[in-house]
């Protein structure tokens, strides 16, 4: 009885195995079918031939070498740019801590920081324009005032950063390294700026404090 159509007969001899064909390269196959292929080259100046085709007017190897040199210069430029932003990031206190700051964040923070420092310098210049009584008082207590001003200057950056951390408190931990320090400790640090001022001297003698209170966000 013959097997049903489409069913292999187990008694039949196995079919002969076909050998693996040689590896074909598409470029070779296309060249055999269509003739010479267009030459791949880097961007360069081309000259139109009378036949209608185009031919390069430059040495291909020189074009590729110039391209490699240009790419190396661009990579070095990007590295220098990233190193510059990294140094600027380490100096600017106005940066979000809940996420990685972008280059735009770093530039905005640097702009705000420069503006605050500029306001402090302007306030220091205005403080020198005092009436004779105030000038006499300043001369009599210059040593204590200088010490207080230096202490205030050392704490400005810390207090600015702390105040901005309170503003974005809901976004995550700030520059305290994730220690979970309560927010009221940061507020106490900001308010302690006025504690370095001599009790016999009014707060308006230190325009830096007033300027700082206007520039910082309300917490």
Swiss-Prot record:
Identify the SMART domains for this entry: HLH (SM00353)
Write the record's keywords in alphabetical order, separated by commas.
Answer: Developmental protein, Differentiation, DNA-binding, Nucleus, Oogenesis, Premature ovarian failure, Transcription, Transcription regulation
Q: Does the keyword DNA repair apply?
A: no
Localization, UniProt: Nucleus
Q: In which tissues is it expressed?
A: Germ cells. Expressed in the fetal ovary, but not by a range of other tissues. Expression increases across mid-gestation, rising some 40-fold by the time of primordial follicle formation.
Q: Provide the Gene Ontology terms for cellular component.
A: chromatin; nucleus; transcription regulator complex
Q: What are the bHLH domain coordinates in residue numbering?
A: 65-117
Top-level taxon: Eukaryota
**Principal localization?**
nucleus
Under the heading SUPFAM superfamilies, the entry gives:
HLH, helix-loop-helix DNA-binding domain
Gene3D superfamilies attached here?
A: Helix-loop-helix DNA-binding domain
A single GO molecular function term of this UniProt record? sequence-specific double-stranded DNA binding
| Stretches for region Disordered | 124-151
CDD domains listed in its UniProt record? bHLH_TS_FIGLA (cd11422)
What pathology is it implicated in?
Answer: Premature ovarian failure 6: An ovarian disorder defined as the cessation of ovarian function under the age of 40 years. It is characterized by oligomenorrhea or amenorrhea, in the presence of elevated levels of serum gonadotropins and low estradiol.
In its UniProt entry, what is this protein called?
Factor in the germline alpha
The organism encoding this protein is Homo sapiens
């Amino acid at each position: 009885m013959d097997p049903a159509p489409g069913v292999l007969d187990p008694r039949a001899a196995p079919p002969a195995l076909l050998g693996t064909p040689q590896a074909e390269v598409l470029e070779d196959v296309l060249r055999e079918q269509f003739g010479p292929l267009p030459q791949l080259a880097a961007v360069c100046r081309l000259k139109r031939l009378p036949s209608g085709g185009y031919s390069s007017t430059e040495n291909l190897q020189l074009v590729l070498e110039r391209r490699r040199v240009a790419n190396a210069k661009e990579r070095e430029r990007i590295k220098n740019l990233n190193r510059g932003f990294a140094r600027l990031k380490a100096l600017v206190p106005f940066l979000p801590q809940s996420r990685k700051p972008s280059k735009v964040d770093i530039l905005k923070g640097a702009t705000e920081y420069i503006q605050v420092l500029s306001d402090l310098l302007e306030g220091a210049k205005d403080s020198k324009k005092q009436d004779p009584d105030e000038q006499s008082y300043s001369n009599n207590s210059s040593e204590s005032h200088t010490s207080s001003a230096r202490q205030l200057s050392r704490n400005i950056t810390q207090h600015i950063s702390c105040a901005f951390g309170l503003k974005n408190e809901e976004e995550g931990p700030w520059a305290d390294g994730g220690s979970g320090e309560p927010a009221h400790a940061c507020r106490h640090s900001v308010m302690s700026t006025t504690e370095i001022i001599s009790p016999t001297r009014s707060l308006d003698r230190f325009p830096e404090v007033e300027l700082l209170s206007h520039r910082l966000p309300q917490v």
